[in-house]
C-alpha cells in the first residue's frame, strides 16, 4: 500500500514505481526473446522469463491498487511484448526499462498504451559487439531510439548506474552518434537529433 497523500503538511518520503524484473540480459543469454539465441538458452533456447505473464498482470494490478506505477525491466522482445500486454490488460501505464530489442508492432504499442521507454544509450556501447554475435539476425531491431520517437513514444534516457556511468552527456553523445569510439555509427538510422536526445534526457 502506498503512503497516503491526504494528510496535510510536508512529506519527506516519496514512493517510486514498483520495479518488476521480467527477464535477464543479452550477454548472459537470459533476455527473453521471440527467437532463439545461436547457442540456445533457457527451456526453448530463447532466454528466460523471471515472472510469468499471469503473475506480471497480478503485480501490476497490485501496484494499481496501491496508486503506484510499474517500471518493468524488459530487455528481450518477448519480455517487452508481455509487459505491454499486461499494461493493456490492467489499463494502467508505466515504463519499460531497457527495451533493447523490439518488434515493429510493439514499437507502435508504446505510444498507443501511454507506456514510457526508459533506455540507456551507453548500453549500446557495452553491448554492440555482443549484439552482432548473439542477435545478428535482429540487430536492426535493437536500440530503436529513432523509431520510438517517430512512433510518438515518450523516450527517457538514463544511465542504469552502477551498471553504466552516470554520464548524461556521454549518453546524449551515444544517442546522437550511435558509437562510443572511433568506429562508424552502429545502425545510424536509429540516431536521435541533438534536440531529441536532450529532451529525452530531461525526463
Indicate where each model-derived feature is located:
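Metal-coordinating catalytic core of metallo-dependent amide/deamination hydrolases
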Residues: 1-77, 109-116, 121-122, 172
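His/Asp/Glu-enriched, well-ordered alpha-helical/loop segment
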Residues: 60-71, 75-94, 98-99, 104-108, ...
Amino acid at each position: 500500500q502506498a503512503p497516503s497523500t491526504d494528510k496535510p503538511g510536508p512529506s519527506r518520503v516519496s514512493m517510486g514505481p514498483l520495479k518488476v524484473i521480467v527477464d535477464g540480459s543479452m550477454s548472459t543469454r537470459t533476455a527473453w526473446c521471440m527467437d532463439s539465441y545461436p547457442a540456445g538458452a533457457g527451456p526453448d533456447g530463447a532466454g528466460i522469463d523471471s515472472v510469468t505473464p499471469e503473475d506480471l498482470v497480478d503485480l501490476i494490478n497490485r501496484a494499481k491498487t496501491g496508486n503506484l506505477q510499474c517500471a518493468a525491466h524488459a530487455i528481450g522482445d518477448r519480455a517487452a511484448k508481455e509487459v505491454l500486454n499486461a499494461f493493456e490488460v490492467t489499463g494502467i501505464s508505466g515504463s519499460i526499462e531497457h527495451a533493447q530489442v523490439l518488434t515493429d508492432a510493439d514499437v507502435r504499442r508504446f505510444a498507443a498504451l501511454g507506456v514510457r521507454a526508459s533506455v540507456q544509450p551507453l548500453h549500446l556501447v557495452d553491448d554492440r559487439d555482443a549484439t552482432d554475435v548473439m542477435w545478428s539476425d535482429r540487430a536492426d531491431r535493437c536500440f530503436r531510439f529513432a523509431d520510438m520517437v517517430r512512433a510518438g513514444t515518450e523516450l527517457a534516457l538514463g544511465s542504469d548506474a552502477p551498471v553504466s556511468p552516470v554520464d548524461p552527456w556521454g549518453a546524449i553523445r551515444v544517442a546522437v552518434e550511435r558509437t562510443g569510439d572511433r568506429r562508424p555509427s552502429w545502425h545510424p538510422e536509429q540516431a536521435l537529433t541533438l534536440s531529441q536526445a536532450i529532451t529525452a534526457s530531461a525526463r
